[in-house]
Swiss-Prot record:
Amino-acid positions noted as binding carbamoyl phosphate in the UniProt annotation, renumbered to this chain: 56-59, 83, 107, 134-137, 274-275, 320
Gene that produces this protein: argI
Main EC class the enzyme belongs to: transferase
Name of this chain's protein: Ornithine carbamoyltransferase
SUPFAM superfamilies found in the cross-reference section: Aspartate/ornithine carbamoyltransferase
Keyword Cytoplasm (UniProt): yes
Length: 335
């Protein structure tokens, strides 16, 4: 029986460094098989529930296509498609769905919700995103980094993340760096740093794995020598508009632009973004942002960087599929 069978995937620190590498190796194998047309279906007859309290493009498509590729069937429960937490408790929902499904994905708000689902469902539960963590995204990121620097192991790579580091991406990056021994720099104003106690705990683990975690407000110091630059949106659609101006003013200096790429001193530096990105005014929100906040060239990243040869964001997006498939196969298949 494989080491992942019937386990949950709630956050990265639930796994050992070796287990994270094993999942990445499985994703690489599954991706190769899909590309060559020789993929073997290991989830035939399995039924999967996808609970989305927050809408999504990449996460939903990745789970659905991964399931179909492997012969499984899915039921999508959107923001208005279930009674979870409204007419029915999370605990009761978990016990009902666990009788009908072989695996459950949750994308929503508090981490406690997905943990409660896992506690009572009796089947593997996977975290597609919560306010605190985004572990499936980090698996895709690590796979993408390995692919683009094949001659470097993860524990020899340097990644600088610019922007608001207090969110689920900042937390999951900390966990990932600590586990694989990466050199991680969180480059942000102090007001946007993660919780200190959590940072300290990840730094302690990083010391054991050979990693290094640095927090700095200094952009030049933070990005110097980086192999990868990473950013995410500065504001979320669910946040009140009143906080947008303050956040944007705070983070404007941390925009990823060509000047920042030059500061790395690495002409081969690559750019990562978990998407969607506000890099132009070709969307309703993007146009509104550009006009209202004087951001004609993009918000967290400029159009110039996003469309450049440095950008590997669509390789990164594709790898959501292969890494999510690896998680499902590993936790629902005995072999």
């Amino acid at each position: 029986m494989n080491q992942f069978y019937k386990r949950h995937f709630l956050r990265l620190l639930d796994f050992t460094p070796a287990e994270i590498i094993a999942l990445l190796d499985l994703a690489t194998e599954l991706k190769k098989d899909k590309k060559s047309g020789c993929e073997q279906q290991k989830l035939v007859g399995k039924n999967i529930a996808l609970i989305f309290e927050k809408d999504s493009t990449r996460t939903r498509c990745s789970f659905e296509v991964a399931a179909y590729d492997q012969g499984a069937r899915v039921t999508y429960l959107g923001p208005g498609g279930s009674q979870i937490g409204h007419k029915e408790s999370i605990k009761d929902t978990a016990r009902v769905l666990g009788r009908m499904y072989d695996g459950i994905q949750y994308r929503g708000y508090g981490q406690r919700v997905v943990e409660t689902l896992a506690e009572f469902a009796g089947v593997p539960v996977w975290n597609g995103l919560t306010d605190e963590f985004h572990p499936t995204q980090l698996l895709a990121d690590l796979l993408t980094m390995r692919e683009h620097l094949p001659n470097k192991s993860l524990n020899k790579m340097t990644l600088a993340y610019l922007g608001d580091t207090r969110n689920n991406m900042g937390n999951s990056l900390l966990e990932a760096a600590a586990l694989v021994g990466m050199d991680l720099r969180l480059v942000a104003p102090k007001a946007c740093w993660p919780e200190e106690a959590f940072v300290i705990s990840c730094q302690a683990l990083a010391q054991k794995t050979g990693g290094k975690i640095t927090l700095t407000e200094d952009i030049a110091e933070g990005v110097n020598g980086a192999d990868f630059l990473y950013t995410d949106v500065w504001v979320s659609m669910g946040e009140p508009k009143e906080v947008w101006q303050e956040r944007i003013n705070l983070l404007k200096p941390y925009q990823v632009n060509m000047r920042v790429l030059t500061l790395t001193g690495n002409p081969q530096v690559k750019f990562l973004h978990c998407l969607p990105a506000f890099h132009d005014d070709q969307t309703t929100i993007g146009k509104q942002m550009a006009e209202q906040y004087d951001l004609p060239g993009g918000m967290e990243v400029t159009e110039e960087v996003f469309e450049s040869a440095h950008s590997i964001v669509f390789d990164q997006a594709e790898n959501r599929l292969h890494t999510i498939k690896a998680v499902m196969v590993a936790t629902m298949s005995k072999i």
